[in-house]
């Protein structure tokens, strides 16, 4: 599979692919890191979980959250996403 990204977005949010989660958790994570994406979130509605990956220079960081959390977007100073709004 060849991917071409015309520009490097700062932040990408993906909904996990139920049929092929490895694609989101491994392949896309590495692809986006190599492309210069600074923050990548993987949202899994079935597990009500959010994995936050962010890249700072040579460091790679990962955080696990649930839909009960208000999650800070690490690359922006004052931006939070409240996932509790999505729970039935």
Residue positions per predicted region:
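C-terminal interaction segment
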Residues: 1-35, 42-88
């Amino acid at each position: 599979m060849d991917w071409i990204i015309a520009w490097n977005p700062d932040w990408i949010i993906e909904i996990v692919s139920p049929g092929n989660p490895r694609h989101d958790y491994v392949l896309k994570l590495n692809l986006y890191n190599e492309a210069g994406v600074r923050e990548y979130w993987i949202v899994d509605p079935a597990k009500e979980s959010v994995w936050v990956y962010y890249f700072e220079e040579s460091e790679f960081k990962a955080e696990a959250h649930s839909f009960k959390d208000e999650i800070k977007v690490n690359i922006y100073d004052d931006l939070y996403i409240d996932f509790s709004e999505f729970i039935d």
